[in-house]
Amino acid sequence: MADNPIYQKLGQLGQHTVQPASPEEAQLERVENPHSGTLYLTRFVAPEFTSLCPVTGQPDFAHLVIDYAPGPWLVESKSLKLYLTSFRNHGAFHEECTVSIGKKIFDFTEATWLRISGYWYPRGGIPIDVFWQSGDVPKGLYVPDTGVASYRGRG
């Protein structure tokens, strides 16, 4: 399977990799979509996403759900994992993290459609949920609910 030409340009999958220090340093990788032209949905869930508050340097935590309808390319999952974990030492507000991740994946993969849902855990007593999508859901695309309940605290 590794001999398949669509995998030959990958530099991270199956290799020892160093954790990127920042999102700017992280390199997403992509492979050809063997079902290009077929409308379907792929979901990635990152329940332990971490970044830093740009003002206080305190950690912020989120549950991210990334739904995308692939176009000609698929995002390679190890590179996505490394990209997402590169935010651990990155200072940015919740909105910046969530929207920039969605836009980068959408542009890089030339996706047909993408939605990212960022469910940020409370800090200072306020949960912040951030949602971005590239446009209207394509007709005929099955998009299940994210399955993430609204934050209820102890209530």
Curated annotation (Swiss-Prot):
One of its GO terms (cellular component) is cytoplasm. It catalyses: 7-aminomethyl-7-carbaguanine + 2 NADP(+) = 7-cyano-7-deazaguanine + 2 NADPH + 3 H(+). Substrate binds at V75, E76, S77, H94, E95. Pathway: tRNA modification; tRNA-queuosine biosynthesis. SUPFAM superfamilies: Tetrahydrobiopterin biosynthesis enzymes-like. Pfam families: QueF. Its EC number is 1.7.1.13. It comes from the Bacteria. It is found in: Cytoplasm. Its main location: cytoplasm. GO terms for molecular function: preQ1 synthase activity. GO terms for biological process: queuosine biosynthetic process; tRNA modification. The active site is at C53, D60. Disulfide bonds: none annotated. Keywords: Cytoplasm, NADP, Oxidoreductase, Queuosine biosynthesis. InterPro entries: GTP-CH-I_C/QueF, NADPH_dep_7-cyano-7-deazaG_red, QueF, QueF_type1. Catalyzes the NADPH-dependent reduction of 7-cyano-7-deazaguanine (preQ0) to 7-aminomethyl-7-deazaguanine (preQ1). Belongs to the GTP cyclohydrolase I family. QueF type 1 subfamily. This is NADPH-dependent 7-cyano-7-deazaguanine reductase. It comes from Hyphomonas neptunium (strain ATCC 15444).
